[in-house]
């Protein structure tokens, strides 16, 4: 892969081709670069090997840092999710942005049933101002096809600010970031005109709702949202034919709590590495179940994310897009200590101060 990588530090990292703005089909007619923007959730500066993390393996992201450019003076717009993402999408300072916090919107009924599971009827967060243009709308107006896969957090179901109404051609993930606290959710959201969708719909996870949301049987659920979202992102890249530039926003929820993932080789590797590990007893009133192997779960989620990044880069190369694609990797804010997470063990935020929800620097 002969490409220059634009890799950033604490909060913004990326990869792109040296040909991105130079390759031409006709003289003096620059070809627009494809852009993939990857935003993970609650990852700190010090959680990657390229920034000194000694315990967690992140070879694909480390390679991006080694080959590319790091933005070491780049900062998130806010130390918490929704306003940070709003700053990115609107280009506004949080003092001017419509979204000031993780405000949640509910339906009139406080709960909804999925199988035997009583679920909170939270449907989303405060919407982006419909009078203010946002990033995917700008890209679409400039000839790009757009796709978003992961957390939205820029409106609630039925509002004027859902992906289908804000410049996104294809979407799969969580409209509501509160729902994203479950990695084995009762439902995900989708907008896919090719499947007949005329707006955002709910896709019920039929296998998951056979088992309860809380207690030991929760871990019998099999539909893991992070893997499903990544699969849809990969399918979207595969569908691109090079006739139109594409802009993808991959807002993976890893490594946000809850700390849980499939029992596969990634997790089992870290269970061996952290043989003397901690447990988390659950949190009353939250969505976080009791878990064992806290350090292994957290480390495994980051390595899993790194694997996703590697698959994205490989797919771009297979499709012949690597010479004209800019890939940016970033986090929405600093590391968290929710659901049993232990940022002190992993070095907190590297050389930076504070954690999620704290304003420093």
Predicted regions and their residues:
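Bacterial Sec-dependent N-terminal signal peptides
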Residues: 1-30
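Hydrophobic, well-ordered secondary-structure scaffolds
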Residues: 10, 35-38
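Short, well-structured beta-strand/strand-turn elements
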Residues: 142-156
